[in-house]
Amino acid sequence: MAAPSAAVAAAATERLAGLATPPGALGRLGDLAVWIAATQGVCPPRELTDVGLVIFAGDHGVARHGVSAYPPEITAAMVRTFLSGRAGVSALAHAHGVRVRVLDLGVDDDLDGVPDDVRRHKVRRSSGAIHLEDALTADETGQALEVGATVAREEIAAGAQLLLSGDMGIGNTTPAAALVAAGLGLPATEVTGRGTGIDDAALLHKEQVVQQALDRAGARTDDPVDTLTALGSADLAASTGYLAEAARQGVPVLLDGLMAVACALTADRIEPGAAAWYAAGHRSTEPAQSLALAKLGLEPVLDLGLRLGEGSGAVAAVPVLRSAVALLRDVALLSEILPGA
């Protein structure tokens, strides 16, 4: 796995130090600007004019086992809402000039009337309830990983300079928490959160479901791909493939909440070093996300208490990255305004 350019990072750091601003005055914006420059391989960095969000949608067998505050039927309804441009992330994307693409990987609905380009990558309807059975077959996992990689290549070929990964699937925080637990070797009690806002009794039950899933998977979690088969889903596997391929192609990714970060952790297990191409858009309220970010060495750009999902936190952070680029590109050098300084 090639890393972002160290030489360009050094040049960007030198330029940052030479700006007509007090040392350290730009804080995290300076760090983000250096990272973007290194991923682009050029200093000053190019403006981020083409940013693409792909939302991977799918249902989860565990959603019918008391782990979510909402019924699985919401997933299909939200796919249609994305397409109408009326979802939360749709409003943010419109405000910030981010392209949105939604794909059905495993929605438990035929989505009649939905455009073929949304449905053509479908791997299966829903996934196995991970505390009782594997989420996917090995072949389905491979298919979903390749779909994600293909979609990343398509987005990059279309001109995307920055990629975002969004999610939609009732119950998806349960397999995502299991993926993080598997990747970090942690028990369910440390990674399980309230998702869409479940009460204390449901949280305890959700912890038990996640731990039962981990116990059932056993040593298979040593293999990241087999982990996806046992504990993931079609949408999470596709997101993992998308994130891994973005890193292979040398295109930066701004991560969203738990689902994106769980997939990023898994992608980094599959392709060690992939995390160098990722930045964390925001800190979610889910404990597993913070644990995975710490493992990946990523500090969130925003901390707003968001738990919407959909890619919303990453989209909200896009203007911050654009601001970072603008500062490194457009602020005068001290040597330009005070020759000889």
Model-derived regions: residue spans:
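N-terminal loops that bind phosphate or other acidic moieties
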Residues: 1-341
